[in-house]
Amino acid sequence: MNIAICPGSFDPITTGHLDIIRRASKLFDHVVVAVGSNLRKQPRLSAAERARLIEKVTADLENVSVEVMEGLLVDFAREQGARVVVKGLRAVSDFESEFEQAQLNRTLYPELETVFIMSASQHSFLSSSAVREIAALGGDVRGLVPDGILETVRQIYSRSDGKI
């Protein structure tokens, strides 16, 4: 079985993330969405809560599962029996950091390949941090996050003081 890992902090999952997951699900036998923590970020929700939101919006994808990932991606990939990491690229600016990460992962797990999927043009500007900022300032995030979690995202990420 060809298993791929689609890792991220998904704080929150966006329509761009979901598009990459859907497209990856057509390329691989099984896709594991790995919800991790970024030491440089303080998410509003726990990894388990973010995983539940992703499960809700990927429920129609039979070959996609969602797991909380702790520790290194390479260790998680080994545990899952995966030899592929799928990453979305929005713009050339994403490539440099993703390339570095892919090279590090390959150093730690030589059998692990990274596959880059270019974002659809309508998602090329989209990021979780932009969604958080828009929601915190009372803006409409419709179309930026999956419909199935729109109200949840509005409630969690909106704040009257405008702080994220």
UniProtKB/Swiss-Prot annotation:
Function recorded in the entry: Reversibly transfers an adenylyl group from ATP to 4'-phosphopantetheine, yielding dephospho-CoA (dPCoA) and pyrophosphate.
EC number: 2.7.7.3
Recorded family membership: Belongs to the bacterial CoaD family.
Main location: cytoplasm
Binding site for substrate: S9, K41, L73, K87
Subunit comment: Homohexamer.
The protein's name in its UniProt record: Phosphopantetheine adenylyltransferase
Catalysed conversion reaction: (R)-4'-phosphopantetheine + ATP + H(+) = 3'-dephospho-CoA + diphosphate
Alphabetical list of PANTHER family matching this protein: PHOSPHOPANTETHEINE ADENYLYLTRANSFERASE
GO molecular function, one term: pantetheine-phosphate adenylyltransferase activity
A single Gene Ontology CC term: cytoplasm
Location relative to the cell: Cytoplasm
Pathway: Cofactor biosynthesis; coenzyme A biosynthesis; CoA from (R)-pantothenate: step 4/5
Annotated binding of ATP, by residue: S9, F10, H17, G88, L89, R90, E98, H123, S124, F125, L126, S127, S128, S129
InterPro entries: Cyt_trans-like, PPAT, Rossmann-like_a/b/a_fold
Residues with site note (Transition state stabilizer): H17
Gene3D superfamilies assigned: HUPs (3.40.50.620)
GO biological process, one term: coenzyme A biosynthetic process
Cofactors that this protein relies on: Mg(2+)
